[in-house]
Amino acid sequence: QVSQLLALKRAQSGAASPNAEAANAAPPHASIPQTIGEAVESVYWEAERLGITIEVEGLEDLPVNADPSFAMKPDDLFTILRNLLENAVRYSPKGGTVTVKLAQIEPPVLCVMDEGPGIPQEDRARVLEPFYRRLGTNVSGTGLGLAIVKTICDRWKLNLTLSDARPENQDAPGLCATLKHS
């Protein structure tokens, strides 16, 4: 899609990067609970159409007045979460569940998990490259979503880890994308 190409170019150009901030400006902070809500809302109708349930975990246990955040622009966190959620919805089976989980509050650790086929260990580095698509999937896409996510994570020094969401299920281990500051 053209919109994903443009998003990748913006991410690669460093537009709105930390170095572009005014020297005396306060560092940006992206509220994780708020951005989760916005990102889930952005993919809700597609998930509904495909029979996918989206669950959010970890926010119900937040202390009063707690607002865990990542040191980054809110729009960048939204782009990361939207891309991860779009992939999770796209690859999950009908009737499946996608889970967004705030696994740790301080420092924040955020996970997006699905029940799809997962990504074999040997392909995990390659799927972060632009235009790379795994063979053998019947899911349409451009191969740009995870490249955009990786580029933005690198810019804001977020560590992105891909692992099996359900390693005990060899047929459909799912994918868990974990975000935390490096």
Could you describe each region identified by the protein language model?
Residues A7, A11-A26, V64-M72:
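Conserved micro-motifs of the catalytic ATP-binding
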Residues G95-P107:
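Short beta-strand/loop element within the Bergerat-fold HATPase_c
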Residues I119-F131:
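Short conserved segment of the HATPase_c
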Residues K157-N169:
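Glycine-rich ATP-binding loops of the HATPase_c
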Residues G145, V149:
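Short alpha-helical Gxxx[C/S/T] motif in the catalytic ATP-binding
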Residues A22-A23, E46-D61:
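Short conserved segments within the C-terminal catalytic ATPase subdomain
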Residues A88-V89:
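Short helix-loop "hinge" at the ATP-lid/N-box region of the Bergerat-fold HATPase_c
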